[in-house]
Amino acid sequence: MSGQGYISSMYKQYKKVISPMGCRAFLSPWYERGGMYPADDKDVPVFTGRFNIGAVSLHLPMILAKARSESRDFYEVLDYYLEMIRNLHKRTYEYLGAMKASTNPLAYCEGGFYGGHLKPNERIKKLLKPMTASFGITALNELQELYNGKSITEDGEFALEVLEYINKKVSEFKEEDGWLYAIYGTPAESLCGLQVEQFRKKYGIVENVSDRPYVSNSFHCHVTEDITPIEKQDLEGRFWELCNGGKIQYVRYPIDYNVQAIKSLIRRAMDLGYYEGVNLSLAYCDDLSLIHISE
């Protein structure tokens, strides 16, 4: 591993393996003595026993459409929704913090969670500082399409500018509130369809934005783009370091793709510091109605 990227750099520096929660959620560092930041060069991060309290995802194309329809500045409208998510997370921390350790003795009293050695009647708020809360990102590709009619494969500058802005705002919230906020490249397995429905109801069908059954998840290029695996890795790499609360880069291959080439591309992704996924197309037998998936 080259050490590029958050996951590999943590391993290179601290020999700490960061396992994802689910398919792509990763915890921001929390240091044993310094908390959000290392107390000194000997302080080490802790990942075991921590968790994420939840993700709330922005509907970026909807926000741009709203700003245009109301003749308002896009970033003014975006700020409104960022503050909304911020307040939702603060309420969640407050709600959870008021719970007693007796609600989950294994986690809060017997050490299941980091610092979880409270008495049954104690509130768990003190345990929540190392736990993250995520601002989710979907449909960066469709945001770019709505902005100037180009995909992130063709352009992507506005999408990158917006993600950099969100990253800056969330960092400010983190400092002001003292909570571990993070930006999450939302997988949006069902949300990607719901967001299209929401957009259509309000703003109708817009080519390459809401004329498909789903939006692209996180910062991914649209699945219909005619690009090579290397091009996809490089195009999505622009957004990689801006979503440290969780993300995945994946490439889809036909079922008969050269296995050695796939291995080479996975190694390339690791050198780039990616958390890499491989999607293989299904092979159907029209005569026997069988489906084959290669190992």
PLM features: residue spans?
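Conserved catalytic cores of very large enzyme subunits
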Residues: M1-K129, K150-I152, G156-L290, S294
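Conserved phosphate/anionic-ligand binding catalytic regions in large, soluble enzymes, centered on
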Residues: K129-L143
